[in-house]
C-alpha cells in the first residue's frame, strides 16, 4: 500500500462506558479522567453524548483541556438527534445551542467534523434533499459528515450533491440487510470518514439493550478490505476512522488492529492486554 498523502486518525466512538472499567481503563472506583487517558493512545474520539442532549459549552471547553497532551488530537461529534430523528421538535434555539457547544472545539482547532447520522428509515427523496440542505446551511461554518443507512442514497448523483455542499460521505460497515448502504471508499467534502459498527445481525434491529447491537469483535481478516479502503481515501482526504463496536472495549481492540495493519505503531491501554490476552498480544 502506498504511503497515505493525508493524515489518518483512528479512534473509538465515545469514552464513557461502565463496562470499560477494568477492561480499557484500570480499576479506579472513583474520579478518573477517561478522556485524557484515551487521548494518550488515539488521535481522535467521536463524541456521542450530544446525540441525546445538547451539551453546554463548558463541557466542550473541558474536553479540549483534557486532550491538551496530544497535539494531534481532534474530535468528531454526533449532532443532536433533534436535527435528524425528531425534527418536528427542533427549534431555532436548538440550532444556537448546538453552535455554542461546537465553538470551543472549532476555535481550538480540535473539531474534525460534525457527524449527521440518519436512521435507515430516512430515504432519498426530494423532501429528504431539502431537509439536508437546510441542515447543512444551519451548520455551514463547521466541517460536516453525513451518515445515511439506506441504499437509495448510495449513488454518484448523491455523492456529487454532497461534494457540492462540502459535506463528507460516511463510509460504514454494518450488518447488510435489504437496501442497506454497502461498504464503500467514497470521499466527498472536507474529510474522509469511516464508521465500523460491527456485524451483529441478530441484534441490529431487535435488542433489549442498545449496547447489544454493537457487541461484535471484528477479526483481522474482516478488517483487511477496510484497510485498503482507508488507504484509498487517505490518498484524497484527511481521514477519520471510528470504531463503534464499543461493548467491553472491542472498539479499542479493532482500532489497534487497524493501526497495525496500516503499518503504524499501535498503542494499547495495558489493561486491555490483560483482558484480551493473545488477541492483542502482537499489537
Placement of each model-derived feature along the sequence:
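Residues lining hydrophobic/aromatic ligand-binding pockets adjacent to catalytic sites
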Residues: 1-283
Amino acid at each position: 500500500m502506498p504511503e497515505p498523502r493525508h493524515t489518518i486518525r483512528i479512534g473509538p466512538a465515545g469514552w464513557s462506558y461502565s463496562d470499560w472499567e477494568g477492561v480499557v481503563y484500570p480499576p479506579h472506583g472513583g474520579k478518573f479522567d477517561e478522556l485524557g487517558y484515551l487521548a494518550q493512545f488515539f488521535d481522535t474520539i467521536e463524541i456521542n453524548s450530544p446525540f441525546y442532549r445538547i451539551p453546554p459549552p463548558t463541557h466542550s471547553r473541558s474536553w479540549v483541556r483534557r486532550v491538551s497532551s496530544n497535539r494531534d488530537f481532534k474530535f468528531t461529534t454526533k449532532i443532536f438527534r433533534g436535527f435528524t430523528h425528531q425534527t418536528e421538535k427542533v427549534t431555532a434555539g436548538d440550532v444556537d445551542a448546538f453552535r455554542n457547544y461546537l465553538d470551543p472545539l472549532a476555535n481550538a482547532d480540535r473539531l474534525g467534523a460534525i457527524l449527521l447520522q440518519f436512521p435507515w428509515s430516512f430515504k432519498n427523496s426530494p423532501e429528504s434533499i431539502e431537509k439536508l440542505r437546510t441542515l447543512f446551511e444551519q451548520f455551514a461554518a463547521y466541517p460536516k459528515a453525513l451518515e445515511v443507512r439506506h441504499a437509495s442514497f448510495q449513488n454518484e448523483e448523491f455523492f456529487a450533491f454532497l461534494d457540492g455542499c462540502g459535506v463528507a460521505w460516511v463510509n460504514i460497515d454494518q450488518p447488510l440487510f435489504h437496501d442497506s448502504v454497502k461498504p464503500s471508499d467514497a470521499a466527498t467534502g472536507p474529510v474522509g470518514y469511516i464508521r465500523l459498527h460491527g456485524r451483529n445481525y441478530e441484534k441490529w434491529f431487535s435488542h433489549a439493550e442498545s449496547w447489544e447491537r454493537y457487541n461484535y469483535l471484528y477479526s483481522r481478516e474482516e478488517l483487511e478490505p477496510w484497510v485498503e479502503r482507508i488507504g484509498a481515501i487517505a490518498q484524497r482526504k484527511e481521514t477519520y476512522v471510528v470504531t463503534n463496536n464499543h461493548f467491553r472495549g472491542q472498539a479499542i481492540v479493532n482500532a489497534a488492529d487497524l493501526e497495525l495493519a496500516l503499518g503504524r505503531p499501535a498503542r494499547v491501554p495495558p489493561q486491555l492486554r490483560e483482558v484480551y490476552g493473545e488477541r492483542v498480544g502482537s499489537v
